[in-house]
């Protein structure tokens, strides 16, 4: 078949270029029978980790090189193509690994947007990449429907809702655009395995309570960053009563909860769902006469693959390590609504119903709640009724496959007959694009996943989140309320929710970290510093965001020099910071083995906020070689490592400095930078050992020793650092 020919699987356009030499599918590191116990996240990462030392096994906290089974990009594919070209790459390492799905701005029919989409399709055609055009559906839904996101595999995407894949037992996590370009070119990128939180769901949901209510409640009741930058594993007796569609909704919104992944186990519910999907696809293919053999015609969704999966199910080991243990009794849950304008505010539906909150717009769209079962739930509420006067009700299916199924079931027609306004399958209002956005002073209720101020329109509007049934009921009543057939007498008391949180009995200490090497530490590359050393600057500020580190007014000055970035670093946080660091840098001199320079220590969630990589490069250009913090914003940390800035955590060091310097402020970290008097910190790259000496506030000399997390800088980070950043690392490998 020539390069111009197209192979079609349902609605997918498969662009085939057999003349392009394809490398084999991603190779996995063999799972080693190493001593110890491992959770499910660690076991899946082990399958996709590469360049491990013989006999090693990955653990939470480790930096590893991963070769994911799938990498998906959407409308941001254009910038990734630019990065791909800038690193000198000319061919895709493994086209079978890459998927393009256009879904965000699909209502935009401008010549500029259509040209952008055309260029992305042409690139896919040239390189033999699976391409799903605008209208096929939201990329995350497509990855599940087409079997790219498959149980016990690893899939990544340049989008924060990659967590959704966990609903089918696939470990999904977001990456940034530079990572995507690196995977295109080399098949791999790096990842720090997060801490893993065990979330135990007990009991069974009462009638009228949904998976959306579960995650809205989790976000609202555990709203103190308990799962920030963690991977979540769902456990418990309650899982058997949750459908795959409900699991997908829950996993999807673990992103808003603050997690980097939300993983359900592969169980009988999962296997039965996949068998049903395969049979359904077979029936369709027989109808159109394109299936040469039943159940094995699809390259990813077929009975052979499902049978193999059922024989090789992974389970966490008894005694596996989790940082926290959260429990939620599903039987005590009632319908909940999130907001306004925050997922951290979760209110029982009956409380809001009594307030008679009028709405202007309602939305049944997005990757969290626009599957066929969601459309059915809304249609069952609205069938034979009409949307209230003055209310606009927007509906978009998660994919064209979903819409076709809803049309055949009569659910789509019921929604349209009631006065709903159809939108093409895609993100649309959820991302603030297209028609139907909230205007000043309006109130909206949505089945989407985010209600941040201004996300769905005007920042002067109010947005609530709820289940599809509640959204539909609100649309026909013109106010926030539940369906008329919701029997509240069968629900538990709205104030009776049972939930708990504890530190897992076998959790590692806050500063503990694993390393696969012996007690001597990780192996250090010849060209990587054996240690980092210098004076210590304490920035006692939690949630120091990227705008505080690098002001937004400079972000789009593309011609700004490294020197200028260094001059404005931390300008919005502490105007004197840059000059202080410049003075310290002038007195530093590195040796061949030790990297000298001022070491910065921040508070918790350092670098939260936007994805601007200048927040990392400005610190590096200022002469700071390494940042310590209680914890980091994940995207900041990825950008830092991708640009050769080392990031390590030390919970105890942050706590000790807080007690010493902020006692009069009640221990609240909300102050400008402090240069520790006569300070010197030495950080061993192999072991993560931190040796610190300085004069305290009272003039007394203090010497302390800590262990960073991870306890030793991983090989993947070392390689990126010595190459001069991820882009140069990729250049060396293509």
Curated annotation (Swiss-Prot):
Its main location: mitochondrion. The keyword Calcium does not apply. GO terms for biological process: lysine biosynthetic process via aminoadipic acid. Keywords: Amino-acid biosynthesis, Iron, Iron-sulfur, Lyase, Lysine biosynthesis, Metal-binding, Mitochondrion, Transit peptide. Residues 1-25 form a transit peptide. Gene3D superfamilies: Aconitase, domain 3, Aconitase, domain 4. It holds the Pfam family Aconitase_C. SUPFAM superfamilies: Aconitase iron-sulfur domain (SSF53732), LeuD/IlvD-like (SSF52016). Its cofactor is [4Fe-4S] cluster. Binds 1 [4Fe-4S] cluster per subunit. It is an enzyme of class 4 (lyase). CDD domains: Homoaconitase, Homoaconitase_Swivel. GO terms for cellular component: mitochondrial matrix. It catalyses: (2R,3S)-homoisocitrate = cis-homoaconitate + H2O. Pathway: Amino-acid biosynthesis; L-lysine biosynthesis via AAA pathway; L-alpha-aminoadipate from 2-oxoglutarate: step 3/5. GO terms for molecular function: 4 iron, 4 sulfur cluster binding; homoaconitate hydratase activity; metal ion binding. [4Fe-4S] cluster binds at residues 367, 427, 430. Its EC number is 4.2.1.36. It is found in: Mitochondrion. Catalyzes the reversible hydration of cis-homoaconitate to (2R,3S)-homoisocitrate, a step in the alpha-aminoadipate pathway for lysine biosynthesis. Belongs to the aconitase/IPM isomerase family. This is Homoaconitase, mitochondrial. It comes from Mycosarcoma maydis. The lineage of its organism: Eukaryota, Fungi, Dikarya, Basidiomycota, Ustilaginomycotina.
